[in-house]
Amino acid sequence: MHRYRTHTCGALRPSDVGQTVRLSGWCHRIRDHGGVLFIDLRDHYGLTQCVIDSDSPAFKAAETARSEWVIRIDGRVRTRPAGTENAELPTGSVEVYIDDLEVLGPAGELPLPVFGDQEYPEETRLKYRFLDLRREKLHANIMKRGAIIDSLRRRMREGGFFEFQTPILTASSPEGARDYLVPSRVHPGKFYALPQAPQQFKQLTMIAGFDRYFQIAPCFRDEDARADRSPGEFYQLDIEMSFVTQEDVFQAVEPVLRGVFEEFANGKRVTKEFPRITYADAMLKYGVDKPDLRNPLIIADVTDEFADDAVEFKAFKGVIKSGGVVRAIPATGAAGQPRSFFDKLNDWARSEGAPGLGYIVFEEEGGALTGKGPIAKFIPPEIQARIAQKAGAKAGDAVFFAAGTEAKAAALAGKARIRIGDELKLSDTDQFAFCWVVDFPMYEWNEEDKKIDFSHNPFSMPNYDRDAFLALGEEDAEKILGIKAFQYDIVCNGIELSSGAIRNHRPDVMEKAFAIAGYGRDVLEEKFGGMLNALRLGAPPHGGIAPGVDRIVMLLCEEPNIREVVLFPMNQRAEDLMMGAPAEATPKQLRELHIRLNLPEKKG
């Protein structure tokens, strides 16, 4: 017989009745029924009920066992008495009568109970993460994460991609966030950086002549934590392809994501064909560049309607005269809501810094659509009808309004759309709704510096005739601000899984792109000289994307916080409470690295 087990704690079935078995695991729960002890023994694979009474020679040893002690038991498998079966357990129709018991690992007083679903402070959970991970739900999340990553890898290989590994110690690059720096002992005063992403390496892999790259890549960024972003490090499905258009990238990525989500969706529907939504349409219709398509409400622009001379609502008139816009957010079926519903939404809008949300409630009177509400009296019936038509409203619906600069109106309308959809329970949450957001602007006007600046990714290829782009001058500001980039985002349920782009592989186009934004060739050479040199030596057209693995797992595990799908996460301050990181270096380590500390004075 094996030293520790003949079966796992999830393996025994009625066909095993009568066998002598050996199990090892943790005491999940112990129940004392007056001379009879029931021990639920748990391991990675499941849970088995074990029974011992005073007739067993191992009874005294069993009486000493406590929760989370690790024990080994020998015993006979028997059928549970009628009426005591547990249909929720695969092993629930059998139990093991204990003949022998050995304590393999006793446990002290637990700072965090494993049995039950009690909520404990984040600090306690992270400090004793190894205990937290014994809990069924979190344990299942981590196993599901591994299965999802296996599925991603398999689907990428089936799509003709090859897995590469890129360096972890590399050079610092200005990619938006702060780098984590690693001092070099061999080169005093010099530092490596942990990669914020393998961006340059994956492009260099294409320039090196490889065709389809992928990697489950660790990325390191010294930035603040969010619910959907783990501090310090995260993983992404890094993808790059040569000789491809934007549509080729979409066709390669969609089957992978759709397949993985269908595999792990627990019966939820998954978008079959991912719709393409332009950035301009996303900002107009949804108020954000990462729309949640589970919500059916679509925002409409009604600036022209409120600008009509027949409209007497001065608040919106003033906004429009100042160059602002008015957006309409439909609220399906809201006409039947009490006044408190509308007051509550106005209070919410004021908490967002807006004066409120004007609204019209549409009802049918005498066969005609009639608007009621605080601002309806300022708007003639024919204009009300136009507003209802644009907003897709009918009798029984309401329409709310957000006014301000284009950016502020879009932001408020986007938040109001989500809020209204949630309040009225309009969203179809039984699905994973994907979309691509495309046609991002290449440039935008920087009002503060009075100059043209990059809007998003400066290294994406402009969607513009190359010769015409190279010929653009200062007098072509309007044309420049209208240029779109071959840049795209993949969004699921309102969460951005990734940005991607067709890369700017032409040095002449890249130099021009940076010159338009006010960056000289010297700046480009200084910051990205290595990449430019590679591009000058025969670079193929290439593009890619990098969906976030942690966010994918978070969605599929239906967890609101990324911490619940990461094995050993840091806290919000990027501290590992379990291992005590970051920690002070010893004087010897600092001397070897030629580092002298200049710490800020402690406050107070």
UniProtKB/Swiss-Prot annotation:
Region (Aspartate): 199-202
Gene3D superfamilies the record matches: Bira Bifunctional Protein, Domain 2 (3.30.930.10), GAD-like domain (3.30.1360.30), Nucleic acid-binding proteins (2.40.50.140)
GO CC annotation terms, alphabetical: cytoplasm
Catalytic activity field: tRNA(Asx) + L-aspartate + ATP = L-aspartyl-tRNA(Asx) + AMP + diphosphate
Subcellular location: Cytoplasm
Stored InterPro entries: Aa-tRNA-synt_II, aa-tRNA-synth_II, aa-tRNA-synth_II/BPL/LPL, Asp-tRNA-ligase_1, Asp-tRNA-ligase_1_N, Asp/Asn-tRNA-synth_IIb, AspRS_core, GAD-like_sf
One Pfam family in the UniProt entry: tRNA_anti-codon
Residue sites binding ATP per the record: R221, D222, E223, E496, G548, V549, D550, R551
Site (Important for tRNA non-discrimination): residue numbering on this chain: H33, G83
Listed transmembrane segments: none
Root EC class: ligase
Domain of life, per lineage: Bacteria
Protein keywords: Aminoacyl-tRNA synthetase, ATP-binding, Cytoplasm, Ligase, Nucleotide-binding, Protein biosynthesis
GO biological process: aspartyl-tRNA aminoacylation
Residue positions binding L-aspartate: E175, R221, H456, R503
Predominant localisation class: cytoplasm
GO molecular function, one term: nucleic acid binding
EC number(s) on file: 6.1.1.23
Subunit structure: Homodimer.
Family: Belongs to the class-II aminoacyl-tRNA synthetase family. Type 1 subfamily.
NCBIfam families, alphabetized: aspS_bact, PRK00476.1
Function: Aspartyl-tRNA synthetase with relaxed tRNA specificity since it is able to aspartylate not only its cognate tRNA(Asp) but also tRNA(Asn). Reaction proceeds in two steps: L-aspartate is first activated by ATP to form Asp-AMP and then transferred to the acceptor end of tRNA(Asp/Asn).
Name of the featured protein: Aspartate--tRNA(Asp/Asn) ligase
Protein's organism: Methylorubrum populi (strain ATCC BAA-705 / NCIMB 13946 / BJ001)
Protein's gene: aspS
